[in-house]
């Protein structure tokens, strides 16, 4: 150990124990300010940075002291009673592609259940269709004539396992789109694409897999009243995004471009978090261009979707606010 080595705080007891105990007492998730206060009030021993790594070796790695709010939302399901997320995919089949899809799914090693034609499912899937290469009338008609559909589900996962699960589903979707399935609906995001769109996502994955996952697995933006938000980032082990019309206006965005700007901002932030997320902390600022106004990110729990819903994000939401 060098006498010049940086000293860092080591909470005693560990920070994850303090945060979990407070959540249990309150009976609800902690806010960013509450997390930071518990961290700031914690009794700590100052140790060399290399020593902290040695202390944690072979034990549960504690919450990142310097980035407690973000790291707690990312890992809280490991320490409290909570629903763990899964990737859930609906595969609609019929015609010549049906036996090929069945074989692909049987060999996938995933949790697969088979179900018969469901008229209500047709409306459900079509209502979730994205605008990327919209399905034509023929494809929509084929969806309505499906004879069988499959519910494909991953094992529940924590944040550090999410990306591997989603990459596995990306490869599965590529194979099913070529079979072809009649439609593929990613229920964990409330999102269905046309087969042409799924093939485009697969082509993008060959060049940039992270960009393909953000583009194909995340619904953005969804509008509710004057709020725009994303859905599906939990499949990548990350929080979703939420921004208000008033914040978009404060950045200088014209009302007719609110949806487009929210989509572009969410996509850029999603890609940044996937590729360089370890650098991100609550309070960091973002902008799409040098000329556009900046927004800062504040972490909070997911409140607009029920916890038992497959679209619920246990890793939280990043609310974007005027700088």
Residue ranges of predicted features:
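A ubiquitous short alpha-helical element
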Residues: 1-8, 131-135
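Short amphipathic alpha-helical segments
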Residues: 34, 161-172, 257-265
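Aromatic/basic-lined ligand-recognition segments
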Residues: 190-323
